[in-house]
Amino acid sequence: MNLSLSDLHRQVSRLVQQESGDCTGKLRGNVAANKETTFQGLTIASGARESEKVFAQTVLSHVANIVLTQEDTAKLLQSTVKHNLNNYELRSVGNGNSVLVSLRSDQMTLQDAKVLLEAALRQESGARGHVSSHSHSVLHAPGTPVREGLRSHLDPRTPPLPPRERPHTSGHHGAGEARATAPSTVSPYGPEARAELSSRLTTLRNTLAPATNDPRYLQACGGEKLNRFRDIQCCRQTAVRADLNANYIQVGNTRTIACQYPLQSQLESHFRMLAENRTPVLAVLASSSEIANQRFGMPDYFRQSGTYGSITVESKMTQQVGLGDGIMADMYTLTIREAGQKTISVPVVHVGNWPDQTAVSSEVTKALASLVDQTAETKRNMYESKGSSAVADDSKLRPVIHCRAGVGRTAQLIGAMCMNDSRNSQLSVEDMVSQMRVQRNGIMVQKDEQLDVLIKLAEGQGRPLLNS
């Protein structure tokens, strides 16, 4: 029996009212709650039940091409934060709206299903009132495969364009090619401009994709592992150290170091980098649940005291700061000691509940960027008052930022910090993301929703998305 949209919504809503919203749904004739376990983002191959997959796919069939508002996606983000798993691949369609491209598992919570089905009911109701305006409704035709329907709606409206010329790209394909401009009649923040931005950045990402033993990227030496992820590599020209996946990044006038979460074997080198840099702030965006997951191999290096080779580290928590939307920043002080070297104190900002491959809101991002900037400025002033030689060295006193891979959450924060700097008022979003990608790797600003946050921040400043 194929449930209609209204029947499916009614059954799901009833179960949510019975406080089963966090359970995954299952479907055999009627909808039921799987109360035996919590949502784990499983596929059939990793242990999801067939009835869970049937439920998830049935919901998906009703929400293909449905426009999700910012309020809808905020509700889905609440679920992502709660379970520390992002189950949804979303794509922006402009004006803060998104569509669901696909699920990342064969499970779906009943609460999330309710959010999606209510969005479908809203659009269906609106379509009835505008039958003659079918061009505004892209509802999924019965019998059309879900992915085919989604793909037809999401195809880019403009062909990919080559990356723009910029001084740092002489070693990359596409350098020196002519720049394309957006038509003057296009809204600077509308769907056409966003699609053009996405197209240009996708082209650059593909150009920068690493080949086997690619000379553009740092290669492991001496048998030691260098990269957490095979496809997320470290630009050789801007590498901080030969044994770390870490890069000097300069976006406009904003200088930082972006790196991956250090491997256990890299901790001594990582601490040495922090000390030599006279790091004014270390921003760790990897969540506490990621660090606790032993499968990820992420040593809890900044919240605990310890000895790493010749380096001794003492950690002390100082305060906790709310950033909004329930996102919290824990503040620590790391004291790094090594025989024959100056003792270095590094402030740490740890955001412990920002899940991987997601975006926090523009408001939270602004608050985090301001906190990191203010912390760094206080420390820089201390070094300046002591007459430190690091003040005159452009390679030092840089905030060090990492999440897990050092490309998604990390790049979202760096982009916001760049926009906080009044010296960068002429930079477009295309400029900022392109500079990050060229200087580290093509995956910087990993997810569409992370780019959407930077776009929203830019729009609030009247900053262009594209270069003219």
From Swiss-Prot:
Record field: compositional bias (Low complexity): 130-140
Compartments, record wording: Secreted
GO cellular component, one term: extracellular region
Chief localisation class: secreted
Keyword terms of this UniProt record: Hydrolase, Plasmid, Protein phosphatase, Secreted, Virulence
Family annotation (PROSITE patterns): TYR_PHOSPHATASE_1, TYR_PHOSPHATASE_2, TYR_PHOSPHATASE_PTP
The keyword Secreted is annotated on this UniProt entry: yes
Residues annotated as the enzyme's active site: 403 (phosphocysteine intermediate)
Cross-referenced Pfam families: Y_phosphatase, YopH_N
Residue stretches making up the Tyrosine-protein phosphatase domain: 152-461
EC number: 3.1.3.48
Catalytic class of the enzyme: hydrolase
Classification via InterPro entries: Prot-tyrosine_phosphatase-like (IPR029021), Protein-Tyr_Phosphatase (IPR050348), ProtTyrPase_YopH_N (IPR015103), ProtTyrPase_YopH_N_sf (IPR036484), PTP_cat (IPR000242), Tyr_Pase_AS (IPR016130), Tyr_Pase_cat (IPR003595), Tyr_Pase_dom (IPR000387)
Single GO MF annotation: protein tyrosine phosphatase activity
Inducing factors: At 37 degrees Celsius in the absence of calcium.
Keyword Repressor (UniProt): no
Region (Disordered): 127-194
Catalytic activity: O-phospho-L-tyrosyl-[protein] + H2O = L-tyrosyl-[protein] + phosphate
Function: Essential virulence determinant. This protein is a protein tyrosine phosphatase. The essential function of YopH in Yersinia pathogenesis is host-protein dephosphorylation. It contributes to the ability of the bacteria to resist phagocytosis by peritoneal macrophages.
Family of this protein: Belongs to the protein-tyrosine phosphatase family. Non-receptor class subfamily.
Quaternary structure, from the entry: Monomer.
Protein name: Tyrosine-protein phosphatase YopH
Organism: Yersinia enterocolitica
